[in-house]
């Protein structure tokens, strides 16, 4: 329970530092790989859900199971979309994929467009906004494991969630 907020924050910070936002290449090349990004997101979500399941609060446990269910539904579609684009571009490096797509040096642009649409829908589902959100659900079910956190741990987990959404 105590390791989740620092781990969640570290993963979100690592992903933020590894994405090529202002440069053509990833500042930290190891973190610019699509496989590393997806497995890091899966690791963070797993520990987030495990934090809820580990607590003695029934609502946090149900929220943790809900997070795992969302992970099972969302992450395969994100992986499939990224792998489809990586297969067309010939690399799993995010910067290389971006350069191939921007220059038009791809063999199947329709496949990349469809993969981009699928990835955008999966990212929107990951955010948990309407219509994929349960607005009528109890706050404990939506937030899940955060019901057990307080103080600096809650602030760190909320900051990591905000970083992941951006």
Regions found by a protein language model. Name each.
Residues 1-166:
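Alpha-helical transmembrane segments of multi-pass membrane proteins predominantly involved
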């Amino acid at each position: 329970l105590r390791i989740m907020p620092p781990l969640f924050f570290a993963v979100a910070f690592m992903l933020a530092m590894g994405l090529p936002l202002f440069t053509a290449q990833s500042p930290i090349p190891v973190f610019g790989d699509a496989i590393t990004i997806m497995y890091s997101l899966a690791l963070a979500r797993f520990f987030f859900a495990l934090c809820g399941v580990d607590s003695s609060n029934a609502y946090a446990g149900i929220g943790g199971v809900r997070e795992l269910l969302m992970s099972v539904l969302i992450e395969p579609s994100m992986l499939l979309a990224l792998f489809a684009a990586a297969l067309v571009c010939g690399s799993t490096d995010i910067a290389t994929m971006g350069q191939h797509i921007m220059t038009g040096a791809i063999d199947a642009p329709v496949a990349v467009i469809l993969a981009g649409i699928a990835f955008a829908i999966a990212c929107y589902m990951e955010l948990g906004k309407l219509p994929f959100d349960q607005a009528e659900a109890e706050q404990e079910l939506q937030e899940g494991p955060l019901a057990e956190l307080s103080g600096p741990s809650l602030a760190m987990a909320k900051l990591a969630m905000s970083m992941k959404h951006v």
